[in-house]
Amino acid sequence: MQLRFLQKNKEEKDMIIAVAGSGGKTTRVHKLAQYYRSLGKKVFVTTTTHMKKESDTVIPENIEDIRKQLNETGYCMAGMPATPENALVQKIGPLPEDFYETAVKEADITLIEADGSRGMPAKIPADYEPVIPENIDEIHIVIGMSALGKPASKVVHRLSLADKDLEIKEDTILTPLHLQKLLKKGYLGPLREQYKDTKIKVYPGQADTLYQRVIARFLQEEKDVAQIKDDWFKIQPKLVIFGAGHVAIQLLRIAKFLDFYTIMIDDREEFADPEKLSQADEVYCRDFHDIEDILPEQDNTFYVVVTRGHANDRLCAETVLRRPYLYLGMIGSKGKVAKTFEIMKEEGYSEEQISTIHAPIGLKIGARTPEEIAISIAAEMIAIKNHETESTMSKELFETKESGVLCIITKKSGSSPRGVGSMMLVTKDGIIGSIGGGNLEKTVMEEAPSMKEITRKEYDLSNAQSATLGMICGGKNEILYVPV
């Protein structure tokens, strides 16, 4: 749908920008307003649909109200009331056409919120949406990254308009590919067909995590999001150790060296002592019947059962079997394990469930001492972790809000030290994470700051170049540079 507004002379310096989509339109409008005001421009903000009324929003009785605000402050958001006075959230709607035309003449920059999504981060627009003025200079399309990983019924406005091409149903868990299809089919395709001479760009919003920021960059540059795997962005697994005896303490030390987030639980106060277990991230003294609320929700959690008694071992194992996990290991001799499994079968646990328990725990290396047993357990955990996931992401990298260039190994051959999915973030102050060290990492660090857009580059570590980059055995790495 189009509204007939002022026909601008394109040679004028003034600009009209429409912001459409969902999941951050108002934030985008404010960001643009702040930028242009910093350049000394007079900025006028309004809507062709509706937007939230703010404390400084002008509800004009006449055009002089808008003109005065613009001239005195260099900024004016204006619109007509669109909700009852007693509404919890007050909104404004479009201005009368003559008010709008005069305000555009007075302002250097006009910013228009041109779409509605009822607070949802994603939207499938109707045929009459977004509502774009005829004299538009730029159209910015927003989509919220907070929709990723959530069911469509909870995060997509006008979901009933989804067709077969979008492959989105009510229970569909949204992936980057869904969002990219939605952008292309719902916004970019139709708008570029209708506004052939208008600059139309994607500006994703609500990108908080590193994964969301990477996907946002791919959507913004309109690059294929299938190049990115979400498995690469899973934090190193959490480890829950039931029991805090000799083996548990040695395993804790190794787990911290391996960068596991570690939770220790014991039912004895003298053992569940935070001072004695200072390397642990969390320590709990709890009866093993009462631990459900302190166990992690993430499905790549490792559980190790090393309590002081058979009954507690079984209780802990049964608790874990009722929740998602990546690894469950239980200490004990073959005889003890067989007896425990027999009781569990009698209690109704299936052979399939019981077969997921690694017991006796650890790789068979003839371990005898607590230190050796801990090493055998850690080795088995590493084997499971590296078989099931490609992520080597540290907690620091997972949680970072730093800007920079993310460098990801997307292909490898030969004996290069790090696998596919390994990554480091090159910031203005240094690096977070690693792609294997050596001269290869040094070279990538040096080249990263010059990467202003998503770029792939292959490093051949064979023969002469191998020696140059410090790789003795050679191989190839493909690095994906992503500014975030």
Predicted segments with their positions:
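N-terminal phosphate/diphosphate-binding loop that engages ATP/GTP or pyrophosphate donors
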Residues: 26, 33-87
